[in-house]
Amino acid sequence: MKKIFTFLFVSLIMSGLFAKSWESNVGAGFTVPFSRIGVDKAGEDDINQLCFGLEGFYLGHHDNGFTVKGDYSIALATSRDITLQDHQTNVGFFTDTSIGAGYSFIRSDNLLFSITGMFGVNISIFKDSNDDVDYNHENVEDNKADYDRTLSLVTLNFGADFFMRYKMGENFGIFTNLAARYIIGGWGADETCYTYDTGRNTRSDTITHYTDLWGYFQVQPTFGVCWTF
């Protein structure tokens, strides 16, 4: 990972040296990430996530075709393979951060087509809470407690982004991007917290279970508008 960030840092420095021949694209659009994650625990099903949100990106390229790209996504995550909440479909939060470099194969006045190798980090968080649930403990008054549970999934991925931009004016344009990634692996944390009254004070008991995540894929189509300068 250190080598990857070193390469990208050097790439950005080189882009500054070629500033006169450098074109930048900044934009935002609607994105629909879909992923499948394997859980390294007996009896646990794979986790399929379908997300809906927004993505912002920067893509810059030199006249010689060298290209760098970075993007950030934030989205609403949905999954029927997570049973944290008392619903058929659980709803959570998803974020993705990716950086990479590659080559722009088409660089005409209006049309730009680039392929970049990308490395990214995904975070998904699902939460649930309830008041006055049954909690049998010797110090719990009335055997009732407030319940909070958080499931966090962190995965690493690498793959390629296929980016196309069409300029509709001097600086304004539309774009589409398809991210195709392999999930290297990751880890999950399932944390449950019970907060209760002992009659003298308020206490909390926290139980956390960790598991490894692995494999499968992430596909993320995006389309929107961009500014070229």
Residue ranges of model-derived segments:
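Cleavable N-terminal export/targeting peptides
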Residues: 1-23
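Generic detector of N-terminal low-structure segments
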Residues: 7-11, 59, 165, 177
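Residues in and immediately flanking transmembrane alpha helices
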Residues: 15-16, 84, 183
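Short glycine/proline- and aromatic-enriched beta-strand/turn motifs that initiate or cap beta-hairpins
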Residues: 19-81, 214, 218-220, 224-229
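Gram-negative (and chloroplast) outer-membrane scaffold detector with strong preference
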Residues: 32, 57-144, 149-158, 166-172, ...
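Short, charged, low-hydrophobicity "junction" segments
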Residues: 44, 89-98, 196-203
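Glycine-rich, flexible loop segments associated with nucleotide phosphate handling
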Residues: 46-51, 89-93, 145-153, 206-216
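Predominantly the C-terminal beta-signal and adjacent terminal strand-loop region
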Residues: 159-229
